[in-house]
Regions:
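Predominantly soluble domains enriched in secretory-pathway, periplasmic, or organellar proteins
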Residues: 1-278
Length: 278
């Protein structure tokens, strides 16, 4: 994981534009030997990238508004928690929600004030991927994370303007049959929140689970993969389909109806398909 840098490329030509060194001191003031960029996401509202620095426990804000497209500096370093991994946004795009998975926390960063808004204690080793948000019938807008180290989904309030009483607090904990989850996904057109259990050690690695948005409870778990492990759900643009990988040297991508969860088609002969991005 060396060197500790990020590089900005031209989006059309892939020509390197600038290389920037990372800060090498963590949130406790300790000088680091390595500092990994764990995730990069683009703000929905401002010309910035939000960058998670794993070992440092810092969320950095990178400004890409230079009209000459030559300078892409870090303009804010926000102390958060170690060790940061993957994350995404709330429904407004104003808050960045990232897992500090070795600390068993979700971190909430306010991108408008560029400050730490909250930390949320979760289960063991939260791993939301880009995460998921939806409107719960009781709690309003929520986000959620699944976990590698524990078989549960932690759902937390994510509407500080509309529901400040439960903002950034756990409101539901939904038990899964196994630990080992890597991704949790949904779409406004689907009634489900879907969770994989890819790293399950109890025989559930071929299954995905469907949580009902209407009831806030686990509805069913069912096998999708045949040769390997089910991993990473991705919806198509209109939310009518969800694509799931069968992670195996003789793998496949399985397309499900996003409402009935019935299989529509299966693309086979794919060696270890993993992420799919729309």
């Amino acid at each position: 994981y060396w060197p500790p840098q990020y590089v900005v490329y031209d989006g059309l030509t892939l020509e390197p534009k600038q290389r920037v060194d990372l800060p090498m001191v963590d949130i406790d003031g300790v000088t680091l030997i390595e500092n990994r960029v764990a995730s990069i996401v683009a703000s929905h509202n401002d010309p910035v990238w939000v960058v998670s620095l794993k070992e440092a426990g810092i969320v950095s804000i990178v400004d890409y508004s230079d009209p000459g497209r030559l300078n892409f500096p870090i303009v804010s370093n926000i102390p958060a928690a170690k060790f940061l991994h993957d994350g995404g946004f709330d429904h407004t795009g104003n808050y960045f929600l990232v897992a500090a998975n070795a600390s068993n926390k979700m971190v909430v960063v306010d991108l408008q004030t560029r400050s730490l808004a909250a930390t949320i204690d979760t289960g063991a080793v939260p791993h939301p991927g880009r995460g998921v948000n939806w409107q719960d019938p009781v709690y309003g807008w929520v986000n959620a994370t699944s976990h590698i180290g524990e078989g549960k989904v932690s759902v937390y309030g994510a509407d500080p303007a509309g529901r400040p009483d439960i903002a950034w607090q756990i409101v539901r904990e939904i038990t899964l049959p196994s630990a080992g989850s890597l991704f949790i996904k949904s779409h406004p057109a689907s009634p489900w929140v879907l969770v994989d259990m890819t790293l399950s050690a109890t025989g559930d690695e071929k299954d995905i689970c469907a949580i009902s948005k209407e009831t806030g409870t686990l509805d069913r778990c069912f096998p999708v993969a045949t040769n390997g492990r089910a991993v990473h759900m991705e919806f198509n643009m209109d939310g009518s389909e969800v694509w799931v990988s069968d992670w195996d040297p003789s793998g496949a991508v399985i397309v499900l109806d996003s409402t009935t969860l019935a299989e529509i088609r299966r693309f086979t002969g794919l060696p270890t398909p993993t992420g799919k991005f729309n």
